[in-house]
Amino acid sequence: MSIVKYMLENNTVFNVPLSHLQKHLTEKEKNIFERFLDENILLRKDLTPERKGPFSRNEVVNFTYDSFRDYLISTYLLDVVEPNNYLKLEALAKEYTAKGHQLREGLAPFLFVHARNSQNNKVINMISCLDWYADVFEMFIWDIDDVLITQDDIALVKSILASDQPGYMANKLIL
């Protein structure tokens, strides 16, 4: 079972039990995985923070970089969850990008860019109704392949640029 699948099924983005991940690996894969974890490049081993005592702590795995975790979650949602269960994707996307959720800031841009670049109109229509869409659009439309930019995108960019908010260009687009 993948680390991302575990996170989604257990509604946690931290502290995946190392023992849980290892039980799905062959001995050769375990050796490679252990060496990979020892380097702390993309994943790292930690001790469970909530358990006390020298013999009660278990090793857990966390992502070294939250943005890499968020990228993998967005990819898993759009490439694995959505084709099999659109309603589940919709519920998770809304939950994970709701105001105050710890994934919102990192996950929303990846959902936007991946949905747009993969031309997933069903997902694009769904996320375009979410409260974060306009802000993410302004910041990340530039990451979309030029051939995928629509006339609606151009019109929205023009309206943003023509807005009469003082300092908008400097604050939002340049800085």
Residue ranges with predicted function:
Residues 12, 57-59, 75-175:
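Extended amphipathic alpha-helical scaffold segments
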Residues 1-80:
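Extended helical regulatory/linker subdomains that flank P-loop NTPase cores
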